[in-house]
Amino acid sequence: MSTLFVNNLNTASGSTITVPTGKVVVGTDGGTFKSPGQIIQTVAAEDTTMFAQGGTSYSNTGLELDITPKYSNSKILVCVREYFTFRTAANTERQADFRLLRLVSGGSDVQVAFQRINQWTADSSTAHYFGKMSAYDKLDSPATTSAINYRTQCKLNASSADLFVSHDSAICTMVAFEIAQ
């Protein structure tokens, strides 16, 4: 067996390099072949533990994942789906704020996505429960090959309401795709 050492492959003519029938080009790891737009890796997380939030300061919901990009110029597509129940007895508008944070190893939290969900209740005689979904996708450009933690937080805009994320063990999910550039 021979080993060929080259830095670039190019065609003598035309624009196609052909591997003969019955022959296979084998890569030794998942990053051997890279083309723009290709998914390099996928990391997924789910959470079914109910998180109750009744305050106006951000708190972690419990949904998070870690990904270590293979290339510093990769984009990371983060898809978040969090089911929650909004409980309020106030006859006014209440807002639930959700955000996605990125923490690169050795750095500080950076908010990379934000979503506000409104709820209006006309009857204040009793508490009402409203099922809602916080769903968003964020194409992030972290510019690193260090470990990244993505996590979600939520808060209320005012008191007299509660959020129950993953209420009744509903599955909340986060999926991160590293996309080659």
Predicted regions mapped to residue ranges:
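Small-residue-enriched segments and motifs
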Residues: 4-7, 65, 98, 174
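Short, surface-exposed loop/turn motifs at beta-strand boundaries within globular domains
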Residues: 2, 38, 58-60, 71-73
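Short, polar loop/linker segments at the starts of domains and inter-domain junctions
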Residues: 17-21, 52-65
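Terminal beta-strand-rich extracellular "head" domains
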Residues: 46, 51-52, 57, 69-147, ...
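Glycine-rich, low-complexity segments
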Residues: 3-51, 181
